[in-house]
Curated annotation (Swiss-Prot):
Name of the protein this chain belongs to: L-cysteine desulfidase
UniProt keyword annotation of Iron-sulfur present: yes
Biological role: Catalyzes the cleavage of L-cysteine to form 2-aminoprop-2-enoate and sulfide. The former then spontaneously hydrolyzes to pyruvate and NH(3). May be responsible for the production of sulfide required for the biosynthesis of iron-sulfur centers in this archaea.
Co-factor: note: Binds 1 [4Fe-4S] cluster per subunit.
Active site: C23
Organism encoding this protein: Methanococcus maripaludis (strain DSM 14266 / JCM 13030 / NBRC 101832 / S2 / LL)
Length: 396
């Protein structure tokens, strides 16, 4: 592998594999609010929060760490109490205030737009000062932090387009000689996500597939109820990080318990998950944890079982594509664990069946499969507005 590709992949990994506390969309809201640096939250006269459909869905009914609350309002309040330097760990160490929640509730206006990832905050205080922040396109891409219309800083995006042009062979070459800093990152990812397993969400037994389902769903449930425990997110999604890692961790536990093979397989899964995300989008009407994290998991599992066998890897991608893509995303919630259970079954069964190119949207190889799923994901984009309308009718 040439040096440029290796440097590019390493940079992407360091940007896209990060700790997140709670569902990444409530973390996104909290981070955006915290960027406004409000010294006295009780001075706020009004606060306007603008979210794209996907961010609204994922924050609507999910637990917010250190609040014992669910949804968008406590995420805003938590952001006012948090430190922007913590980014997606913004709720770390906050002391929640019910009094502040009651105060903000009367002053918060939420607007939902049809857009790629977008979280904008506008705050006006009782002295006439205005504070703004805008995060768009990815969860850490801060575009506008302003005080009284003065730009504080601006951060540009990454080499996403170049990464999208890489091939599966590039990822396989990269994991042959992994930089030490990335080995440490993968080890941290394994430890952090494994630590999320708390009891049983679904307990089907002790065979390999059951262990995959048990561990993956338990970790997902821990995140979705808002436990004060970080996950290592992949492509800015904690659940996608769980789907891309825990099925492989469980498979290794039930089979060889080979640390070197586990690290390579996890890393390959993560690289594929990021690739699939860049080919489509961070958020969409299609469940990314299953369609993107699941594709990562199946490629990682197939590598663990069969090594660098392109024929087998293409076969696994085809079989996975014939199964689960198309599952809708109706927001972050406890029910996400059930979707990840389906993802585990689809990934595992893809190791043993070869579905041919003639079936439905199945591509000839891994790359075509990812591109076809991405195309379906983009076509499904208009569904988000309808999903949000249905969710907004609820009183919770």
């Amino acid at each position: 592998m040439d040096d440029y590709k290796r440097i590019l992949i390493t940079k992407i990994l360091k940007n896209e594999v990060t700790e997140a506390l709670g569902c990444t969309e409530v973390g996104l809201i909290g981070y955006a609010v915290s960027l406004c640096n409000i010294s006295d939250p009780f001075s706020i006269e009004k606060i306007e929060l603008t979210l794209n459909n996907g961010s609204f869905k994922n924050a609507y009914a999910v637990g917010v760490p250190n609040t014992k609350k669910y949804g968008i309002l406590p995420a805003v309040v938590g952001g006012l109490l948090g430190d922007h330097k913590n980014k997606l760990l913004v709720f770390n160490g906050i002391k929640y205030s019910q009094k502040l929640e009651d105060f903000i509730k009367e002053r918060l206006k939420i607007r939902v737009i049809n857009s790629p990832l977008y979280c904008g905050v506008k705050i006006k205080d009782n002295s006439g000062n205005t504070f703004e922040s805008l995060i768009k396109d990815n969860h850490l891409n801060v575009v506008i932090p302003k005080i009284n219309n003065k730009l504080i800083s601006e951060i540009n995006g990454s080499e996403k387009e170049e990464y999208k042009n890489l091939e599966l062979l590039d990822f396989l070459e990269y994991i042959d000689e992994i930089p030490e800093e990335i080995i440490q990152l993968v080890e941290k990812t394994i430890y952090t996500n494994n630590n999320l397993i708390k009891g049983d969400f679904l307990n089907f037994g002790n065979d390999c597939l059951s262990n995959m389902v048990n561990k993956t769903t338990s970790a997902c449930n821990t995140r979705m109820i808002g436990e004060n425990m970080p996950a290592m997110s992949v492509a800015k999604s904690g659940n996608m990080g769980i789907m891309a890692t825990l099925p492989i961790i469980a498979y290794d536990y039930s089979n060889e318990q080979n640390q070197e093979k586990l690290i390579k397989s996890i890393l390959l899964s993560v690289l594929v998950t990021i690739y699939a995300t860049y080919k489509s989008s961070y958020l969409s009407s299609m469940c990314g944890c299953v369609s993107k994290g699941g594709m990562g998991a199946v490629i990682g599992l197939c590598y663990y079982k069969n090594g660098k066998n392109i024929k087998k890897l293409d076969s696994a991608a085809r079989t996975f594509t014939a199964n689960l893509p198309g599952i809708i995303c109706d927001g972050g919630k406890v029910g996400c664990a059930l979707k990840l259970a389906s993802g585990c079954f689809a990934a595992y069964s893809s190791l043993f069946v070869d579905i041919s190119y003639e079936n439905g949207i199945v591509g000839k190889n891994f790359k075509e499969c990812v591109e076809n799923i991405s195309e379906i994901s983009k076509i499904m984009g208009d569904l988000d507005s309808d999903i949000v309308k249905i969710m907004s009718k609820k009183e919770i």
